[in-house]
């Protein structure tokens, strides 16, 4: 029933640049094998593109990594991949992520989740079957855009509109989102540099300043990874 409602209320059928490029990713890379393996696993199983790859297609950037979301649980993802002889590893399985390896391509496949408990660094999650529930736990609207293999967008938080307008909007309460994971302060800066020519919202800056010390709770590995991404941002040096 949830998938039916998604198709009616939250999906947009596109025949434009975005749709065609997402279709090309499906048809011209081994991603089609992932879609076949998971979508055919059961009558209700489904996998969708999510996050950065869609954001980059919309902004006509080079897609250099592909993240996928699925309503299968991690052990079911493993079984679906085994059924099609697709290699994978389970290093992120505790957080719901299985990484499939096909030729030179890596695909991170993450089960739908909802947060049970957060501490500013990590979240304790519970797996879900609800796409809107998964979208609601993500950090920014521009990262909560999904697409099926045919390029039909599922965008419950109006992320495409925000991306087109250069609006970097937290999903839900900004302070709650930051306190769940203080890395989101740096992610906000990176996405703002990349995608916005607008002025910062004063309230957002107040909240960031109020919580800036939370960054000290983060591991050096996570901080270094985010700083590397920040320095590679299109607008980092203007």
Predicted region positions:
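Catalytic cores of the polymerase beta-like nucleotidyltransferase superfamily
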Residues: 1-238
């Amino acid at each position: 029933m949830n998938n039916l409602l998604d198709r009616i209320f939250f999906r947009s059928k596109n025949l434009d640049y975005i749709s065609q490029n997402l279709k090309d990713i499906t048809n011209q890379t081994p991603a089609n094998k992932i879609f076949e393996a998971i979508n055919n696993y059961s009558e209700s199983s489904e996998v969708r593109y999510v996050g950065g790859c869609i954001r980059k297609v919309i902004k006509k950037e080079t897609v250099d990594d592909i993240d996928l979301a699925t309503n299968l649980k991690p052990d079911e993802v493993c079984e679906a991949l085994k059924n099609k002889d697709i290699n994978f590893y389970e290093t992120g399985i505790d957080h719901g992520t299985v990484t499939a390896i096909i030729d030179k391509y890596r695909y991170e496949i993450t089960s739908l989740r909802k947060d049970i408990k957060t501490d500013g660094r990590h979240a304790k999650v519970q797996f879900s079957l609800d796409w809107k529930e998964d979208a609601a736990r993500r950090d920014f609207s521009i990262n909560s855009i999904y697409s099926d293999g045919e390029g039909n967008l599922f965008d419950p938080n109006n992320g495409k509109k925000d991306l087109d307008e250069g609006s970097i909007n937290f999903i839900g309460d900004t302070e709650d989102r930051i306190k769940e994971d203080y890395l989101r302060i740096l992610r906000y800066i990176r996405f703002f540099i990349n995608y916005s020519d607008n002025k910062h919202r004063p309230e957002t800056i107040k909240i960031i300043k109020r919580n800036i010390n939370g960054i000290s709770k983060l591991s050096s590995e996570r901080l270094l990874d985010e700083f590397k991404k920040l320095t590679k941002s299109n607008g980092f040096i203007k």
